[in-house]
């Protein structure tokens, strides 16, 4: 039977698949819309499975809070273009809502949880891979709780390229908590305070700094003093409370929070794609890859 343009349009709207894929599916199923949808889903899922070896190093972070619970998550895509797609943004929001409401312990538990639409989180993501046409991955998330007497600070940089969720104790000042989150996004400290730095790491740095000072030919009687000074600078680079506050470098972060009788309880910072090695291919390698097939 002849397939009409209206049928193709309807199938595209229902599945998000390409025009030629829709026309082919309708032809193969003699114009049966439901069977065509099933066929495209089968092909879409197969297509999604074939994409599993791709590196998804773009994407976005998102933060949502509801009362005393908050969630920060990172979802990866293969291209920045898809990360700006409305369908991708809808997926990001839907996943955030689910994680916030259900608070799974880890990724494995999250992927197996049933959503309101009846599918598992994994099935929901896979169905969106078929529609969007790229590998999509829920990479990580953290669900954080606070007390009524504490404050959440949520900050997204560059539309979600970096996300930080902070918790301050001793204050309900959300503006201050957001300022701290903004600082963490900009400076990326590894620890809140010096007491979180292991003795092993501190001693290792001290040994390196000592050797540096001796190599510079400094007298041994002043090496120890120099090393402690440089070690303080090391702590300033990696510890949030010791850092100059980005909005007012004349003050340390610890002074800013202490002025409000507050303390930094915790923070989570996600930067899209950090730690993921993006595959770099040039034309010569592409030709070689084709030759080897």
Curated annotation (Swiss-Prot):
SUPFAM superfamilies listed in its UniProt record: Elongation factor Ts (EF-Ts), dimerisation domain (SSF54713), UBA-like (SSF46934)
Pfam families to which the protein is assigned, alphabetical: EF_TS (PF00889)
Keywords, ordered alphabetically: Cytoplasm, Elongation factor, Protein biosynthesis
Region of interest called Involved in Mg(2+) ion dislocation from EF-Tu, as start-end residue ranges on this chain: 79-82
UniProt feature coiled coil, ranges: none
This protein's record includes keyword Ribosomal protein: no
A GO cellular component entry from the record: cytoplasm
Molecular function via GO: translation elongation factor activity
InterPro entries: EF-Ts_dimer_sf, Transl_elong_EFTs/EF1B, Transl_elong_EFTs/EF1B_dimer, Transl_elong_Ts_CS, UBA-like_sf
Subcellular locations according to the entry: Cytoplasm
Function: Associates with the EF-Tu.GDP complex and induces the exchange of GDP to GTP. It remains bound to the aminoacyl-tRNA.EF-Tu.GTP complex up to the GTP hydrolysis stage on the ribosome.
Family: Belongs to the EF-Ts family.
Record protein name field: Elongation factor Ts
UniProt organism field: Bacillus velezensis (strain DSM 23117 / BGSC 10A6 / LMG 26770 / FZB42)
Gene that encodes the chain: tsf
């Amino acid at each position: 039977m002849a397939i009409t343009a209206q049928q193709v349009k309807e199938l595209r709207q229902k599945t998000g698949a390409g025009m030629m894929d829709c026309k082919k599916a309708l032809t193969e199923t003699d114009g049966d819309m439901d069977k065509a949808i099933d066929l495209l889903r089968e092909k879409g899922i197969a297509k999604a499975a074939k994409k599993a070896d791709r590196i998804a190093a773009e994407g976005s972070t998102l933060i949502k809070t509801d009362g005393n619970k908050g969630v920060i998550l990172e979802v990866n895509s293969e291209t920045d273009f898809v990360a700006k797609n409305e369908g991708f943004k809808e997926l990001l929001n839907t996943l955030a809502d689910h994680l916030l409401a259900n608070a799974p312990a880890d990724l494995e538990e999250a992927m197996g949880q049933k959503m309101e639409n009846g599918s598992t989180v994994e099935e929901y993501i896979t169905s969106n891979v078929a529609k969007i046409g790229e590998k999509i991955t829920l990479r990580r998330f953290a669900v954080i709780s606070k007390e009524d007497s504490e404050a959440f600070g949520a900050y997204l940089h560059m539309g979600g390229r970096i996300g930080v969720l902070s918790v301050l104790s001793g204050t309900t000042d959300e503006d201050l908590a957001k300022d701290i989150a903004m600082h963490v996004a900009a400076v990326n400290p590894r620890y809140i305070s010096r007491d979180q730095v292991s003795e092993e790491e501190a001693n290792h740095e001290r040994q390196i700094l000592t050797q540096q000072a001796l190599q510079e030919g400094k007298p041994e009687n002043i090496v120890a003093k120099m090393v402690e000074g440089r070690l303080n600078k090391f702590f300033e680079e990696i510890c949030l409370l010791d850092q100059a506050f980005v909005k007012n470098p004349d003050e340390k972060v610890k002074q800013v929070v202490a002025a409000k009788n507050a303390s930094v309880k915790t923070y989570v910072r996600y930067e899209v794609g950090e730690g993921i090695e993006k595959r770099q291919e040039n034309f010569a390698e592409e030709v070689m890859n084709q030759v080897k097939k």
